Amino acid sequence: MTKLIQKGEDSIQLQLWDTAGAERYNSMGSSFYRNSEACILVFDLTSPESFKNVEIWRNEFLTTLNPPDKSTYPFILFGNKSDLPDIKVKNEDIQAYCQEHNNMPYFSTSAKDGINLEEGFNKVADMAYNRNTKSEESFIPDTKFLKITQEEPKKKGCCG
């Protein structure tokens, strides 16, 4: 799925790849992840096992993409299927995970009903936009000024 989000005069293209945690997509990861500026991790709120896999998926993503600073790479977490009554993943566990990972933003979503998807997509677009803006700024070299003074030649003489 591709979604275009407008940020001022800039357009941000979100490309969403639903691999459903399938191992068969692991070998294709590098082509999926190349040039990405942020990552949405999605788990099933009705499956504690799915939530446990979030850390595995996050680590695989970071290993494959190999960004310069893994600790600050922007992730966002979606807990999907919030429309279902049998939610089994505890909010406390989700909050703890997000706090452990740089206060990762979290959205309880429903792909079926469209709950919180727009808000989540806008948040990840903001994160990618801010990351891209900061990385462009980092290419501007710092300007340093050096004061050059010329020493007065010493006078030679008998009293000098």
Model-predicted regions and their roles:
Residues 1-28, 34:
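Switch I (G2) and immediately adjacent beta-strands of P-loop GTPase domains
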Residues 4-11, 63-160:
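Conserved P-loop small GTPase signature centered on TRAFAC-class small GTPases
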Residues 16-17, 40-44, 77-80, 108-109:
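Conserved beta-strand segments of the P-loop GTPase G domain that flank and frequently precede/overlap
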Residues 19-22, 47-48, 114:
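The beta1-alpha1 cofactor-binding region of Rossmann-like NAD(H)/NADP(H)-dependent oxidoreductases
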Residues 20, 45-46, 61, 82:
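Conserved Walker B
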Residues 25-48, 54, 64:
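Inter-motif core of Ras-like GTPase G domains
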Residues 27-31, 52-56, 88-92, 119-120:
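Generic recognition of short, well-ordered alpha-helical segments
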